[in-house]
Amino acid sequence: MAGTGIIAIAAAIAAFTGIGAGIGISLATGKAVEGIARQPEAAGSIRTSLLLGAALAEATAIYGLVVALVLVFLKM
């Protein structure tokens, strides 16, 4: 039974990757909006870089969620 508590804590820590991804994506979006406001002609390039970065940041959140679900439901 002691292992169940440790698994719950590990799953909670893994689920917190969503917070980091959210903060990272919001900071990147803010800087992209600033960049587009300063140089509207570079909007396409900035938007492409933003989408690539946001996808990579969101992938870490998805991996964290998968790890948390595996820990909770499979009780490794």
UniProtKB/Swiss-Prot annotation:
Do you know which PROSITE patterns this protein is assigned to?
ATPASE_C
What InterPro entries would the database entry show?
ATP_synth_csu_bac/chlpt, ATP_synth_F0_csu, ATP_synth_F0_csu_DDCD_BS, ATP_synth_F0_csu_sf, ATPase_proteolipid_c-like_dom, F/V-ATP_Csub_sf
- Name of this protein: ATP synthase subunit c
Matches recorded under CDD domains? ATP-synt_Fo_c
GO molecular function term, any single one: proton-transporting ATP synthase activity, rotational mechanism
Q: Which organism is it from?
A: Ruminiclostridium cellulolyticum (strain ATCC 35319 / DSM 5812 / JCM 6584 / H10) (Clostridium cellulolyticum)
* GO CC term, one of those recorded: plasma membrane
Q: What does the record note on quaternary structure?
A: F-type ATPases have 2 components, F(1) - the catalytic core - and F(0) - the membrane proton channel. F(1) has five subunits: alpha(3), beta(3), gamma(1), delta(1), epsilon(1). F(0) has three main subunits: a(1), b(2) and c(10-14). The alpha and beta chains form an alternating ring which encloses part of the gamma chain. F(1) is attached to F(0) by a central stalk formed by the gamma and epsilon chains, while a peripheral stalk is formed by the delta and b chains.
Q: Where in the cell is it found?
A: Cell membrane
Q: Indicate whether Nucleotidyltransferase appears among the record's keywords.
A: no
**Keyword annotations of the record:** ATP synthesis, Cell membrane, CF(0), Hydrogen ion transport, Ion transport, Lipid-binding, Membrane, Transmembrane, Transmembrane helix, Transport
Annotated family: Belongs to the ATPase C chain family.
User: Which NCBIfam families does this UniProt record tie to the protein?
Assistant: ATP_synt_c (TIGR01260)
The record describes its membrane topology as: Multi-pass membrane protein
Q: What is the lineage of its organism?
A: Bacteria, Bacillati, Bacillota, Clostridia, Eubacteriales
Q: What does this protein do?
A: F(1)F(0) ATP synthase produces ATP from ADP in the presence of a proton or sodium gradient. F-type ATPases consist of two structural domains, F(1) containing the extramembraneous catalytic core and F(0) containing the membrane proton channel, linked together by a central stalk and a peripheral stalk. During catalysis, ATP synthesis in the catalytic domain of F(1) is coupled via a rotary mechanism of the central stalk subunits to proton translocation. Key component of the F(0) channel; it plays a direct role in translocation across the membrane. A homomeric c-ring of between 10-14 subunits forms the central stalk rotor element with the F(1) delta and epsilon subunits.
Location of site Reversibly protonated during proton transport?
A: 58
Gene behind the chain: atpE
Q: Has the keyword Transcription been applied to this entry?
A: no
Transmembrane residues, as ranges? Answer: 5-25, 54-74
